[in-house]
Amino acid sequence: MEAEGLDWLLVPLHQLVSWGAAAAMVFGGVVPYVPQYRDIRRTQNADGFSTYVCLVLLVANILRILFWFGRRFESPLLWQSAIMILTMLLMLKLCTEVRVANELNARRRSFTAADSKDEEVKVAPRRSFLDFDPHHFWQWSSFSDYVQCVLAFTGVAGYITYLSIDSALFVETLGFLAVLTEAMLGVPQLYRNHRHQSTEGMSIKMVLMWTSGDAFKTAYFLLKGAPLQFSVCGLLQVLVDLAILGQAYAFARHPQKPAPHAVHPTGTKAL
């Protein structure tokens, strides 16, 4: 009798918690990038952030949206993908603008310091998506090139999905590729840190938020009975996040000593 009397409170409370979890699922994924975005804007330096993180998330979330057409899953996960795509495009726009501005400033300083009046400013060649140069893939000079690449990938992947949507094997494979790609999210940052033997320029807050967010996301997948691919993705992401935090701890304890007479090129690209 008492349990029935509490239904008027427990049912709305359960609904409120469910809505809160869904909202956290939709918007929580973009929160880790807020401190990194602010750091880049404040310092006007994007060297510490690997733009390949954006590439991984764009591919993963586009594939996840296409997977939804073959196997419907919860709406919050679908909205999360759409918002994450917009967020990654904003990150790419900022990183591209900052990198190009820094390269231009470096050329201006070089020209001003030149002793010869006849010396000309050496303008770096513009790199474009339409050049189809694999050596400069994802290192283009204009944000519009990234947009063209994303649209081209979406169009091709969407057309293939349209032709194969009736194949259960294709749909499950598509879902697996989506979550496997997302599980590799931290790998570009992990590799960059290993290559430079430093986490300088990387936002520790961002990685901590990655870890907490991925742990929450994995628990959400398990509790909501999401497709198995999602849970596997979440567990792999947590492991990669912990590896990056381990790098930050190790490099802080044993910082790399700068080599004598080392030349530090301006505008070094992350990854």
Curated annotation (Swiss-Prot):
Which SMART domains does this one have? CTNS
Q: How does it sit in the bilayer?
A: Multi-pass membrane protein
Transmembrane region positions? 8-28, 49-69, 76-96, 145-165, 168-188, 232-252
**One Gene Ontology cellular component annotation held by this UniProt entry:** endosome
Q: Which keywords are on file for this protein?
A: Membrane, Phosphoprotein, Repeat, Transmembrane, Transmembrane helix
Question: What's one GO BP annotation on this UniProt entry?
Answer: phospholipid translocation
Q: Where is the PQ-loop domain?
A: 14-80, 178-233
Provide the protein's localization: Membrane
Kindly list the positions at which Phosphoserine occurs in this protein. S110
Q: What domain of life?
A: Eukaryota
Which InterPro entries does this chain map to?
PQ-loop_rpt, SLC66/Scramblase_ANY1
- What name appears for this protein in its UniProt entry? Solute carrier family 66 member 2
Which species does the entry assign this protein to? Homo sapiens (Human)
Q: Which gene encodes it?
A: SLC66A2
